[in-house]
Design a protein with these regions (language model features):
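Non-catalytic architectural context of zinc metalloproteases
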Residues: 47-56, 60-194
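Early extracytoplasmic/domain-onset interaction patches
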Residues: 1-39
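Short amphipathic, basic-aromatic surface patches that mediate peripheral association
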Residues: 39-45
Length: 194
């Protein structure tokens, strides 16, 4: 189940510390789609520079033709107008063990949405889907996130969703080998991944 705004998160070589993101926009702005990455993270409103970790960014139209993208400032880009869907491919360098950014190596992956998910300007209120792909060469990793599952099995890779961009960036993702437990405290269900 893919939304009109769909993100695919993958990594060919986790030890490279790079997430590969494919963003597909079914109905981009006919004047040229703007994309942006927040300079803040929910719960920590210091100005941050997450966009500095985007190492490559390119786009293609539905026929596979290159679409020109230009930087507008340090955290936003504009793609040339296209007819039909727009696909944006980019890499994010993930080598920050803090809880605010992203980290990826051969042992685990972690990210906050503010570090990985470019916002689609003018469509932030739209529902989104996210396909989390198991990194190549990995066989026993699981996924811990509060993102609502669409087709993913519990603790599994697959498709997740969010009602809008704000909801998307409010759900961190951890992937790797971990112990998982569920319990109830004061009538409230809890889950923990360690």
């Amino acid at each position: 189940m893919q939304a009109a705004i769909h993100y695919r998160v993958a990594s060919a070589v986790p030890a490279s510390h790079r997430f590969h993101i494919t963003l597909t926009i079914a109905q981009p702005d006919p004047q040229g789609q703007c994309l942006w990455l927040p300079d803040w993270i929910p719960g920590s409103y210091m100005i941050r520079d997450f966009a500095r970790n985007i190492t490559k960014l390119n786009a293609i139209d539905s026929l596979g033709r290159t679409v020109v993208c230009r930087a507008l400032d340090k955290s936003s880009w504009q793609c040339a107008p296209v007819d039909g869907p727009l696909t944006v491919n980019y890499e994010v360098y993930a080598w920050d063990l803090s809880v605010r950014s992203a980290h990826l190596d051969q042992h685990h992956g972690y990210f906050n949405g503010t570090s990985l998910f470019l916002a689609v300007a003018g469509q932030e209120a739209n529902a989104v889907s996210v396909e989390l792909c198991c990194p190549e060469g990995v066989v026993d990793w699981q996924v811990a996130t509060t993102l609502p599952r669409l087709t993913a099995a519990p603790l599994g890779f697959g498709c997740y969703g969010a009602e809008n961009y704000d909801a998307l960036i409010d759900h961190p993702v951890e992937m790797g080998r971990f112990s998982y437990a569920e319990f109830e405290a004061a009538g409230v269900p809890h889950a923990i991944a360690i």
